[in-house]
Amino acid sequence: TLQKLTGPQSWAELPWGEYYREALERQLQPWWPKLFGFHLLKMGMLSAELATDKCAISHQVNVGLEGEGLQVIADAYQLPFAAKSVDACLLAHTLSYADDPHRMLREVDRVLIDDGWLVISSFNPFSLLGLGKLVPGLRRRQPYVSRMFTQMRLLDWLSLLNYEVLYQARFHVLPWHRKGGKFLCTHLPALGCMSVIVARKRTDRKSV
């Protein structure tokens, strides 16, 4: 049976959530000017809150089932957009709270144009946050209740859908520290609580 998850309506609902948001924005800042096209989908409330004003795509649409500031109310598994109509999609921890993350990824793939951009962030299970999932008193609380994917698993999914990964990183080792612990982030980035992937949908589809 699929696990029913309820995602936060804001980064502020997560312990140290504003630190996570700031850290993710710093990671993505160099990438936004490189994205181009006509339409950027920001899927879910955490995506909607991320600053994307430096993105070269001017038409940005916040999509979700409920919450403030959404332009489109829609089910992420049945997006009301034509196939290959969207230039870029941001999934900021959206898969982490998805009942069926792989199905959601396939639906996003459907609406993305060839060579479209996909940005995914999630929590890293091999981190201090990941350890929290092992503590009975914590595992039902945010953010420990979320799914935490290894980067290898996400990369496998993207490979199956024929995406080229242009950037991947783990960062923000100390969740309670605004800068994530600079020394540890420099020398032990693999233990970062957060992970991010920037990928592009490639047109040379492999025949299955």
Place the predicted regions along the sequence by residue.
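Class I SAM-dependent methyltransferase SAM/SAH-binding core
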Residues: 26, 30-79
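Hydrophobic beta-strand segment of the Class I
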Residues: 89-90
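Conserved class I S-adenosyl-L-methionine
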Residues: 117-145
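Short alpha-helix
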Residues: 135, 145-168
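Conserved catalytic loop of SAM-dependent methyltransferase domains
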Residues: 164-192
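Conserved small/polar residues in nucleotide/adenosyl-binding loops
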Residues: 208
